[in-house]
Structure formats: structure tokens, C-alpha cells
Amino acid sequence: DLQHARDLMVAGLPYGVRKVVELARALCAEPQLLLLDEPSSGLNVEETEDMAFWIQDIVQELGITVLMVEHDMSLVSRVSDRVLAMNQGEVLAMGAPREVQTNPAVVEAYLGSIDDVASLRREAA
């Protein structure tokens, strides 16, 4: 509900609300494809949940295809039906969110290899 903010300038709105306003502005053009760059960037947990709701609603209710770049894998898994994981310009995996998130190449790129973890443990001991 944005009624309380209707007379404020966009710049004076809280960051999370500004992101929703930006999303609404983009939807005014009635696009068939919506490109989102890090839609959860700078948002707190509650605002990220709201963003997930809006993205799902855009897809389901308006039938708009959403293509986004996002590092928050939790958000990705909730709103995406297809995921492409990349690292330094190289495609690591493509498919359903769970398939991609559990792909060994993706896990290694985000968390490091088992050898890296073992080496860090030895150094810490």
C-alpha cells in the first residue's frame, strides 16, 4: 500500500519503495519482456520478499517474461523456472533452479572446491 507516499517525490521515498515505483514505471509501457538487474540489491529481507511477490505476480497475472541478473539464490529459486549460472563469462549450468544450484561446477564457483575448503581448514588449525 503506497497511499501514504502518493504526494512524495520518488527520491524522498525509502529505497525499497523506490524499487517498487521503478518496477511500476517499467510496467506502464506494457512490455512483453522485463529486464531486471539485481532486483533484490539493497533490500532488506522483508523488501526482498515483497519483490519476490511482485515478480511472481508480473509473470503469473500479466504474462510478462522476466529476465533478471540476480545473486540472491533464494530469490532466484522462488521466482524462476529456468536459471543460467555464469562465472567470469563462462556458462556453468542451465536448467531448473534446484538442478543449477546443486550442479558441482556452480557449487564450486560459489563456495570453492572441496580441496579449497580442506586447505583452509588445515591453515586454520
Predicted regions and their residues:
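Glycine-rich phosphate-binding loops of nucleotide-dependent enzymes
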Residues: 1-125
